[in-house]
């Protein structure tokens, strides 16, 4: 009975596989939004103010960072919790694949969240005259919370690895 239960528990990790595959659909959606933004900007690029172009660029960087985060979670999560990726000898293999444990993944996710939050904060500062001081304060507090959380997670990971 115990062996059956343990095998069932071990096999249940495959429930995560479609979830990781679903993240690729989110990645596709981000790609669509990325190019939608580019196609929206191209016809009016010569009439745009520099500030508006910088804001669009920050939005595109934001989408790119989120996409990278999705790829990292998708591949690393699959390898850590479901099965090792076998992409073949003749195809490109990402250098970090198979090297990120769950602790490293959490730290990379936290760093990505801080980077994404920084982009949002920069967009807020680019439009500071249209945003109330209370909202700016809340954005800053949330960003500082992300930074401190990422720092704490990294520190805890460092002391537990010793």
From Swiss-Prot:
Cross-referenced InterPro entries: UPF0114, UPF0114_bac
GO cellular component, one term: plasma membrane
A Pfam family matched in the record: UPF0114
Transmembrane segments: 15-35, 53-73, 136-156
Compartments (UniProt record): Cell membrane
Keyword NAD in record: no
Topology with respect to the bilayer: Multi-pass membrane protein
Primary localization: membrane
Highest taxon listed in the record's lineage: Bacteria
Keywords: Cell membrane, Membrane, Transmembrane, Transmembrane helix
Listed NCBIfam families: HI0507
Family: Belongs to the UPF0114 family.
Protein name from the UniProt record: UPF0114 protein Sputw3181_3501
Lineage: Bacteria, Pseudomonadati, Pseudomonadota, Gammaproteobacteria, Alteromonadales
């Amino acid at each position: 009975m115990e062996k059956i239960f343990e095998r069932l528990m071990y096999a249940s990790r495959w429930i995560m596989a479609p979830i990781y595959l679903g993240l690729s659909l989110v990645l596709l959606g981000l790609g669509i939004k990325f190019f939608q933004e580019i196609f929206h900007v191209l016809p009016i690029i010569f009439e745009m103010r520099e500030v508006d172009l910088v804001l669009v660029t920050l939005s595109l960087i934001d989408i790119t960072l989120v996409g990278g985060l999705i790829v990292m979670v998708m591949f690393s999560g699959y390898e850590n919790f479901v099965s090792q990726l076998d992409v073949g000898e003749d195809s490109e293999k990402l250098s970090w694949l198979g090297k990120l444990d769950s602790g490293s993944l959490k730290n990379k996710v936290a760093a990505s969240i801080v980077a994404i939050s920084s982009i949002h904060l920069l967009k807020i500062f680019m439009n500071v005259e249209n945003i109330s001081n209370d909202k700016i304060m809340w954005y800053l507090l949330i960003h500082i919370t992300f930074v401190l959380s990422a720092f704490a997670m990294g520190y805890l990971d460092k002391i537990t690895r010793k």
